[in-house]
Amino acid sequence: MLARQNMIRIFISGLILSGWMASHADTPATPIISIIIDDLGYQYKVGQRAVRLNGNITCAFLPNAPYAGRLAEQAHLQQKEVMLHLPMEAETENHLGPGALTQCMSEKAFKTLVHSNLAAIPHVRGFNNHMGSRLTKSPRLMGWLMQAAMFRDDLYFVDSRTTTESVAQLEAERRRIAATRRDIFLDYDRSAGIVADQLTELVRHAKRQGTALAIGHPYPETLATLEAWLPTLEQQGIKLVPVSELIRIRLQRRIAPWQMSSSHSPRVAKNSKQ
């Protein structure tokens, strides 16, 4: 009887352990971060400085910016992942520049502009919203956006979360476009002290959640802080990866291990801006 009870205890312990291992098998042992530098393409020297940052920084370029194509080529040569930073109508301060999506556009014009904006940036792997606090709240318009993006089967989407009411990530996932959202804004305040504090929060978030995604801008304060901070990542035990890799890890963590082989994978595995 005692032997049978011991066998039952061992069996139950095994089930508990195997369940724990299944739930933790895809959790990165090393905290993973990604950093997107937005708003690239208008200032050539500033863009070069961003492209030359140490490690797997992801570079997001505004469509039709005078140096966007040239800098995107340089980013690709530097083995940086390239994104389209897609202008979208905001609630206020709509200084969006060329290529902006607005709510007054017809469906055809809207989708045509999405296609031309994506075509304007070489080596583009994904896209995120520039401003967009008005547009990203609209399921209809975000549906148009994601339908237009489906002509490429390898694009991902990052919701910059310029409003807490955004439905952009949801609409992307409804169409099986790999998507995620920003966790940290590095430079809602441009002071170097704030950027450093936000980088500390980025690491804290990654250690707590396994992954963390930050967005910054090519401000002198942000670039200088990153230039000093990025070489310290290995010492901190943090891994910087392209956004596509972070999304792949996050998607794996959302799918139970026993679902991996049967599930249909998606098409690729304080803020002041609105």
Predicted segments, located by residue:
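Catalytic beta/alpha-barrel core
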Residues: 40, 58-64, 128-138, 153-163, ...
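Hydrophobic faces of well-ordered beta-strands that scaffold small-molecule active sites
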Residues: 33-37, 57-60, 80-86, 127-129, ...
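Active-site beta->alpha N-cap acidic-glycine motif
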Residues: 27-94
